[in-house]
A protein has these predicted regions:
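Walker A/P-loop
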Residues: 14
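Conserved substrate/cofactor phosphate-moiety recognition/catalytic segment
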Residues: 18-67
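Conserved phosphate-donor/acceptor-positioning beta-strand/loop module used by diverse small-molecule
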Residues: 94-116
Length: 164
């Protein structure tokens, strides 16, 4: 069974993937899968990671996953859980048996975005303040009838849902 859990920045994807890994489950944060993702300019050319959110937005850069790479990665597991998101996430849906959207309370997201433990805090802010990447994903999930997961649940509670 191949399961995708996607959602906007600071919804808890990294935390959940790590918690499940600690339980011995094949769970991965998409950002930690070497070779899965990269940044691209508007012409589709791979670029170095932007220094901050303003650079990415101003230059119309996109953070995308490689479908070919993901297909190969998923083939290595009979059961696997991928937590993540990208600008082309909907193009990956057909690779998964189940798909969930991780919905977090906006206030909790803001607090998480301000955490000193964020991997790349410069990407979480722009000239207007805090930046939530992928907030458009909720609308996509609603339109596609994807099941929502409450991010305030424990990793064990969420695993109980996604492992069925």
């Amino acid at each position: 069974m191949k399961v995708l859990i996607f959602g906007p920045s600071a919804s808890g994807k990294t935390y959940l993937s790590q918690a499940l890994q600690n339980l011995g489950i094949h769970a991965f944060d998409g950002d930690d899968i070497e070779g899965l993702s990269a940044w691209y300019n508007k012409n589709g050319k791979k670029i170095v990671t932007p220094e901050n959110a303003d650079e990415a937005i101003t230059n119309h850069y996109s953070f995308l996953w490689s479908k070919k790479f993901l297909t190969n990665f998923l083939s290595k597991f009979s059961t696997v859980y991928i937590f993540g998101g990208s600008g082309n996430i909907t193009h990956m849906f057909d690779l998964f048996d189940k798909i969930y959207f991780l919905k977090a309370n906006p206030e909790i997201q803001r607090k998480r975005l301000q955490s000193v433990f964020r991997k790349n805090p410069m990407m979480d802010r722009n000239e207007k303040g805090l930046m939530v990447w992928g907030d458009w994903l909720e609308e996509v999930a609603q339109k596609k009838g994807i099941t929502f997961l409450d991010a305030s649940q424990t990793p064990e509670q969420i695993f109980e849902i996604i492992s069925q």
